């Protein structure tokens, strides 16, 4: 069941929003607003959980594989937390740089700790932990 709501926006904000949703390919404002709300709910659930609930996240890493034992350190962290690693994708971007994308799933505090550990590993050029969802609580 859908409920209709109304919102008020400052001058120019609606114009910017319409441009954004057109660029992203949304067919209407409603679907774009629903996606914004879903994203906010996922973020809140991830950050406000007790840490015991199951959570899903994606970690993106870019690093120089020639960097002194960095690849081994990253692999070690993954092996220490192997139950949380659902999937790992490793891409050779060029002769030196690697892109690694990991899907993590487990207790929230464990997922966050592992993701932050990977991102903070010395030598990682870019790292990001992005909360995701298994979709159970979303409509």
Curated annotation (Swiss-Prot):
Organism: Anaeromyxobacter dehalogenans (strain 2CP-C)
Keyword set includes DNA-binding: yes
Function: Transcriptional regulator.
Family: Belongs to the transcriptional regulatory CopG/NikR family.
Record text on cofactor binding: Binds 1 nickel ion per subunit.
GO process annotations (BP): response to nickel cation
Domain of life where this protein originates: Bacteria
Keyword Glycosyltransferase: no
Segments traversing the membrane: none
Keywords linked to the UniProt accession: DNA-binding, Metal-binding, Nickel, Transcription, Transcription regulation
UniProt-listed Gene3D superfamilies: ACT-like. Chain A, domain 2, Met repressor-like
Protein name, entry field: Putative nickel-responsive regulator
Pfam families registered for this protein in UniProt: NikR_C, RHH_1
Binding site for Ni(2+): 79, 90, 92, 98
GO molecular function, one term: nickel cation binding
Known cofactor(s): Ni(2+)
């Amino acid at each position: 069941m859908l409920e209709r709501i109304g919102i008020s926006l400052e001058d120019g904000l609606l114009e910017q929003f319409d441009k954004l949703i057109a660029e992203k390919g949304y067919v209407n404002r409603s679907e774009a607003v629903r996606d914004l709300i879903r994203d906010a709910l996922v973020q809140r659930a991830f950050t406000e959980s007790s840490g015991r609930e199951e959570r899903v996240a994606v970690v993106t890493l870019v690093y120089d594989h020639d960097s002194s034992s960095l690849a081994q350190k990253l692999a070690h962290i993954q092996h220490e937390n192997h139950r949380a690693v659902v999937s790992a994708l490793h891409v050779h971007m060029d002769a030196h740089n690697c892109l690694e994308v990991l899907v993590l799933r487990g207790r929230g505090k464990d997922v966050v700790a592992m993701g932050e550990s990977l991102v903070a590993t010395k030598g990682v050029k870019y790292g990001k932990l992005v909360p995701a969802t298994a979709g159970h609580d979303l409509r």
